[in-house]
Amino acid sequence: MDVLPHGGVRFAITHVLLPLLGFALALLAMRWSGGDQWLADRLYALQGGEWALRDAFVTQTLIHRFGRYAGIALWIGVVVAWLVARRRVEWAPLRAPLAYLAVAVALSVLCVAWVKSWSNMDCPWDLTRYGGLRPFVGLWDVRPLGLQRGACFPAGHAGGGYAWLSLYFFLGAVRPRWRWAGLTTGIGLGLLFGIAQQLRGAHFASHDLASAAICWTVAVATWQVFRPAMVRSRRLAAGTRAQGTQA
């Protein structure tokens, strides 16, 4: 018995090549068309020429701060569940899938943070165009000497949401029919966190796209590593159910 999605050439095309090509084209289109500034201009204008939602309860406290704590708590819950599964025989089929989920989420967040540590880009609220003090400097542009470094690309908070794209593969091993719900959950969390941060002036849309691309890449790569163990877990689950039926 296999886990879903199945591997092979079709998987490489549908889960690796096409998604990453889509992310790359979207990021290039945003850069060439000025889509980041176009969207940020309108969000800024709708708030009266300021980032009025920067410190609002919903965007700052509820979604940004509480959302971060909720994500950490959920990840800790996955780790605790994995520890319990290691001690309880009836939970044995969940060991590999839970380990995958914990590792994939953590690696996604860490990879986003790592790229953010050297990318050196500013937040919209830092730019003179939106009431800040710094000029816009693109990702591949030479940053002027003396200009304070930026730390806003890719989007860390949105990455905390998109990290849960790995639910697609976790549920593919545990409840294959639910895997699309897992994918939808990861996309929904990433969009929720990302849009809230854009409304605050903390990120451009391309920052969120980059985070989604990183998290999906990590989820796929980690799945390839854990897939053999997840297949064994699926077979163990099927054997356990068969023994229970015979009993």
Regions found by a protein language model. Give the residues of each.
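Structural signal for the C-terminal ends of transmembrane alpha-helices
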Residues: 2-5, 79-90, 169-175, 221-227
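N-terminal transmembrane-helix/juxtamembrane module of multi-pass inner/ER membrane proteins
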Residues: 2-78, 116-119, 124, 133-134
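Membrane-embedded catalytic cores of phosphoryl/pyrophosphoryl-handling enzymes
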Residues: 11-19, 137-247
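Alpha-helical transmembrane spans of integral membrane proteins, capturing the lipid-embedded, hydrophobic core
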Residues: 19-24, 73, 101-109, 212, ...
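Alpha-helical membrane-inserting segments
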Residues: 25, 29, 36, 75-83, ...
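Aromatic-anchored segments of alpha-helical transmembrane domains
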Residues: 25-28, 106-111, 187-198
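Transmembrane helix-loop junctions in multipass membrane proteins, especially transporters and channels
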Residues: 35, 86-90, 117-125, 202, ...
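Membrane-interface loops
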Residues: 91-174
